[in-house]
């Protein structure tokens, strides 16, 4: 068992297992899931987060639902039997396109697999999705590491936002995969600035913890310090992940990403986005069509369970924002790199 096993199949318990990321970094706790409804609750409640990891969790959610139904007797028509559970999973996090991608990959198997083999076949496909994601992350890490600047006078300093690492994927990470690969390529001569990422503190709780596990020099800042550090020449590049990429290269990512992209452009700092092609939604023409999840006001008014805002104040809590493609230096995926991404360049990545 790896400490970064965020969404896997537990052979001993015969069900899905997820690392409860809400408890990090203070506790390492695993939770177990035996139905699609339970898995959807786990996804919605952010036990797991990060688009690729959500996709893996969703796939295992389909597998556990089939296993649950099979215990009651093999359904005469699997698509009908699975419809409610799959709909529940689909609605759990609307912005992360990998969730829908995983469901659409699993659904045809309900029609084409002999009925008695469906539960095992779905589990095999969930395993395949997980293994493919790990390989994808390592490939984009190699592509991205070659793009990052080097600094002969001091360690290269990379800023990142939210958590796009092993905890947000099946393993290794997208943005942090690029950072891990660059750290190796530059023989450790690299530092990371992790934005704390209000209001859920994924940068402080997850990214800082994850990078420290790998002994990568990491400095934590509050989100509103980023511009000052850029203005003072303390940042060489910004690398982030994505929850959905539109066909034209616009990117939805954790709220605050757009702000960083604008600041990076102002200070001539390269701004990179790393995500697998499964995160690209070719049916979504531009970022304007990406649904933006609005989460609970409590995430803003409370911090680690303690109220920090005036009682009765109104709250906005969009979980994501959209960064226009024109602000992105390059989009990095497992197939390669699209510099100054646009619709034509994104489409070409699917042809490699």
Swiss-Prot record:
GO terms for molecular function: S-methyl-5-thioribose-1-phosphate isomerase activity. Catalyzes the interconversion of methylthioribose-1-phosphate (MTR-1-P) into methylthioribulose-1-phosphate (MTRu-1-P). The gene is mtnA. It catalyses: 5-(methylsulfanyl)-alpha-D-ribose 1-phosphate = 5-(methylsulfanyl)-D-ribulose 1-phosphate. Pfam families: IF-2B (PF01008). This is Methylthioribose-1-phosphate isomerase. The record marks 162 as: Transition state stabilizer. Pathway: Amino-acid biosynthesis; L-methionine biosynthesis via salvage pathway; L-methionine from S-methyl-5-thio-alpha-D-ribose 1-phosphate: step 1/6. It is an enzyme of class 5 (isomerase). Keywords: Amino-acid biosynthesis, Isomerase, Methionine biosynthesis. InterPro entries: IF-2B-related, IF-M1Pi, IF_2B-like_C, Initiation_fac_2B_a/b/d, M1Pi_N, NagB/RpiA_transferase-like. Belongs to the eIF-2B alpha/beta/delta subunits family. MtnA subfamily. NCBIfam families: eIF-2B_rel, PRK05720.1, salvage_mtnA. Substrate binds at residues 49-51, 93, 202, 253-254. It comes from Magnetococcus marinus (strain ATCC BAA-1437 / JCM 17883 / MC-1). Gene3D superfamilies: translation initiation factor eif-2b, domain 1 (1.20.120.420), Translation initiation factor eif-2b, domain 2 (3.40.50.10470). PANTHER family: METHYLTHIORIBOSE-1-PHOSPHATE ISOMERASE. The active site is at residue 243.
């Amino acid at each position: 068992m790896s400490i970064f096993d965020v969404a896997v199949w537990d052979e001993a318990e015969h069900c899905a297992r997820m690392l409860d990321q809400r408890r990090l970094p203070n506790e390492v706790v695993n939770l177990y899931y035996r139905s699609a409804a339970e898995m959807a609750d786990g996804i919605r409640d952010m036990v797991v987060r990060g688009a690729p990891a959500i996709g893996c969790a969703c796939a295992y959610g389909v597998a556990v639902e089939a296993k649950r139904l099979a215990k009651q007797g093999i359904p005469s028509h699997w698509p009908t039997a699975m419809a409610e559970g799959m709909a529940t999973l689909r609605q759990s996090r609307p912005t992360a396109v990998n969730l829908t991608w995983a469901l659409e990959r699993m659904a045809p198997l309900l029609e084409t697999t002999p009925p008695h083999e469906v539960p095992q076949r779905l589990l095999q496909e969930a395993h395949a999705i997980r293994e493919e994601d790990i390989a994808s992350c390592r490939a984009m890490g190699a592509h991205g590491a070659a793009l990052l600047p080097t600094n002969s006078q001091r360690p290269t300093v990379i800023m990142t936002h939210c958590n796009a690492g092993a905890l947000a994927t099946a393993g290794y990470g997208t943005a942090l995969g690029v950072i891990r690969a660059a750290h190796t390529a530059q023989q450790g001569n690299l530092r990371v600035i992790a934005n704390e990422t209000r209001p859920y503190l994924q940068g402080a709780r997850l990214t800082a913890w994850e990078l420290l596990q790998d002994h990568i020099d990491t400095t934590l800042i509050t989100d509103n310090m980023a511009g000052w550090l850029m203005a003072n020449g303390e940042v060489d590049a910004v690398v982030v992940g994505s929850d959905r990429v539109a066909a034209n290269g616009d990117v939805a990512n954790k709220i605050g990403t757009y702000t960083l992209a604008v600041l990076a452009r102002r200070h001539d700092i390269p701004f990179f986005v790393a995500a697998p092609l499964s995160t690209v939604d070719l049916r979504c023409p531009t970022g304007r069509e990406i649904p933006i999840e609005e989460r609970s006001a409590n995430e803003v008014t409370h911090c680690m369970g303690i109220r920090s805002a005036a009682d009765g104040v109104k709250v906005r809590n969009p979980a994501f924002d959209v960064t226009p493609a024109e602000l992105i230096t390059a989009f990095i995926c497992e197939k390669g790199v699209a510099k100054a991404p646009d619709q034509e360049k994104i489409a070409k990545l699917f042809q490699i």
